[in-house]
A protein has these predicted regions:
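Hydrophobic alpha-helical segments at protein termini of multi-pass membrane proteins
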Residues: 38-45, 101, 119-122
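Juxtamembrane boundary at the C-terminal end of a transmembrane helix
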Residues: 122-131
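Juxtamembrane helix-entry segments on the extracytoplasmic side of multipass membrane proteins
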Residues: 3-5, 72-77
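Cytosolic juxtamembrane helix and N-cap/initiation of the first transmembrane helix
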Residues: 1-12
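Juxtamembrane helix-break-helix junctions at the cytosolic face
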Residues: 59-75, 96-100
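Cytosolic, membrane-interface loops and tails of multi-pass inner-membrane proteins
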Residues: 22-40, 95-103
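Interfacial loop-to-transmembrane junctions
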Residues: 94-116
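Core segments of alpha-helical transmembrane spans in multipass integral membrane proteins
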Residues: 10, 14-16, 21-23, 38-66, ...
Length: 131
């Protein structure tokens, strides 16, 4: 189980760093032009904090796998992370329109890869909590 936590830790830290390219990749300079200053800043600041918390989740999994798998507190943290990633998996299917990826090879691949990743996270966190 600790190996899974290490894999998750590294993966989440990489995912967090990928957020750095979001403004350029999604062309936020143009796409967000029509938004108010408040909404523009909410997009960028919330993206930063999402990336930060994902990075810190990864760091926790990477550095504290033993505690997460071997203590009552670690199991409780796993429950919280399991709930978080279960909601994220739900949003993957019911929050985003399939129009964003259906019929687009790259976007479909990303949808499938991340759906699988969210399932993997759920499997590990819930299995650890219930063990």
């Amino acid at each position: 189980m600790q190996l899974h936590f290490h894999i998750i830790g590294i993966s989440l830290m990489i995912l967090a760093l990928i957020h750095i390219i979001f403004p350029k990749y999604f062309n936020w300079k143009e796409e967000l032009k029509s938004l108010s200053l408040m909404n523009k800043q909410m997009m960028t600041i919330h993206t930063f904090f999402i990336a930060l918390i994902v990075f810190l989740m990864g760091l926790l999994c990477l550095t504290s796998a033993g505690e997460l798998t071997g203590t009552k507190l670690g199991k409780t943290v796993s429950l919280g992370l399991g709930i978080f990633w279960a909601i994220r998996l739900f949003v993957q299917f019911f929050g985003y329109s399939s129009k964003l990826w259906r019929g687009k090879p790259f976007e479909t691949l990303i949808h499938i890869v991340f759906s699988g990743f969210w399932m993997y996270l759920n499997g590990v966190f819930w299995t650890n909590y219930l063990a």
